[in-house]
Amino acid sequence: MKKATKLLLSILPISSISFLSVVSCSTRNSNAKQPDKKPEKPNENTPKTPSKPDESKQPDNNNTNPGDSNNGSNNPEIKPDPSENPQSDQPMDKPDEKIDKPSHSDKPQADDSNNNRDIFSDLDKISKEISFETFSFYTQRDAVTALVDLQKDPSTIYTIFSKDYKTIFDKYHIQFLANNEESANNEKGLIEKVKLKFTHKKFDQSKILDFIFTGFKKNEYTSITNNKEKYITKREKVEKITDLFPSLIGYVLLYSQDHNQYKNLMEAKNVINFEDLENGNSSLFIDKAPLLNVATIKDYLFEFNPELGKLYKEKITAVKYDDYNGILGVKLEIENRDFDPKTTKEPIIEKEFVFDNFRKVNIKDNEKNPLSLFLTQDKFKEMTKSGLLKTKIQELRSSNKLEKKELLQDKKIDFLKQQIFKNLLVDINDNSHNIYRSQSTLSLGSNKTYKSILGLAGGFSIYPFHTSINKDSIKNIYLSINKDEENVHKAIIEFEVYIPVFSTGFSDLKSYATSGDEKYLVLKIVQTTSIQ
């Protein structure tokens, strides 16, 4: 066999010899390997023919290393050992298809490119009902209030997703689309049609889903809430206090309930104010007149359920009055008593009551009113000795204009009005209803001798009714001179005092806003005195 091989090698061309060498080496390599031996360098002076194998030695495998750079250009081509390079079975001129193909992870997905695969499929698996029961801030709020809070600060929504749906929270940007037809239901304690927008962080695609938010405080309406309506009822017939003017009752109601709120309205001089009227005053009313305080007046106006009084309490918040039509309105706030746990969740209610049978100011017949004004003869005589009246009297006498009334329109008329106002006195005599009664003479201007009825700041009164009188209330001043039977000259003064009759809407009466449709009680005053 060895001799045949040598003979064949001497005949075949070099290219064939190379192929046979590969076969020969590969066969030997499979039987025995000696990686530790180094290849011997061939002698460059010998003919370039295959050397005879040394039968006394094992074949040297290192001769097959394709990386041996010391082999000459005429040396036979040595193929790599297939056992050392698994890819040597591939043809050298054909690329390795397995290596050049894109890996499965890098290859574009068919569903992504064709938009056939739903990237939001995981959103279909989450519950579309989100509970806020673990957040005490929201469990204490009704749905309407909670919705307003979430529109201002939706961070709690994101907190819920970060805890209950962490995978979704990490995968998507979540956005609350506020003011987008969401609907709050206080009775059920939920918010419906809440729209959340989910934007995929990788693909930058979005999807909007509707959710229901639950866990908010429910408005529970129980039958006991309606009992506030039954707690206070209007008396069918109000007695005793209806002979008084409604403005007086309204002011005393509010003042008696809270003195501090109305003390700044009172004048501190010698006047009639709240303190003179509260709890009755025999110098201003008849002895049988009712006490004027909040408890007594409420008892005259209302009927109270004593059992419900254990659960509720009331407070007067506003009053309205119309002294011309005899109308009194009272607005009450009814709330729960603090000490009763059974009613702590019940809402406060307001009730309005209107009473239309109170006393009216009669602007046509002053005899039916308790208020009258007068100027004493002595004061008028004193006024004629100086100022405008003295000048006018001299003019009338010198021109012999007797029994002819002259309207005073001099530029000094304001000073005369101030004199008249300061000297006017007040008489309270109630012939019609017999309830108002002043045991002493009163005045308009404040002084040490007489107590003024204008006991509220700004020239206002509350007794016998709420009105305002000042020097400008005095109008149409006439002066005339006559002679009596004894040929004594007399000066006669006539003037009118316009007293407004107020009506108001519901208010706390701390200001003097009126309806604007004012009526006037006009009092005509005449006085005569002899002159020199």
Curated annotation (Swiss-Prot):
<comment type="similarity">
    <text>Belongs to the mycoplasma p72 lipoprotein family.</text>
</comment>
<comment type="function">
    <text>May play a role in virulence.</text>
</comment>
<feature type="signal peptide">
    <location>
        <begin position="1"/>
        <end position="24"/>
    </location>
</feature>
<feature type="region of interest" description="Disordered">
    <location>
        <begin position="26"/>
        <end position="119"/>
    </location>
</feature>
<keyword id="KW-0472">Membrane</keyword>
<feature type="lipid moiety-binding region" description="N-palmitoyl cysteine">
    <location>
        <position position="25"/>
    </location>
</feature>
<feature type="compositionally biased region" description="Basic and acidic residues">
    <location>
        <begin position="91"/>
        <end position="110"/>
    </location>
</feature>
<dbReference type="GO" id="GO:0005886">
    <property type="term" value="C:plasma membrane"/>
</dbReference>
<keyword id="KW-0564">Palmitate</keyword>
<keyword id="KW-1003">Cell membrane</keyword>
<keyword id="KW-0843">Virulence</keyword>
<feature type="compositionally biased region" description="Low complexity">
    <location>
        <begin position="59"/>
        <end position="75"/>
    </location>
</feature>
<dbReference type="InterPro" id="IPR019992">
    <property type="entry name" value="Mycoides_lipoprot_LppA/p72"/>
</dbReference>
<protein>
    <recommendedName>
        <fullName>Immunodominant protein p72</fullName>
    </recommendedName>
</protein>
<keyword id="KW-0732">Signal</keyword>
<feature type="compositionally biased region" description="Basic and acidic residues">
    <location>
        <begin position="34"/>
        <end position="43"/>
    </location>
</feature>
<keyword id="KW-0449">Lipoprotein</keyword>
<feature type="lipid moiety-binding region" description="S-diacylglycerol cysteine">
    <location>
        <position position="25"/>
    </location>
</feature>
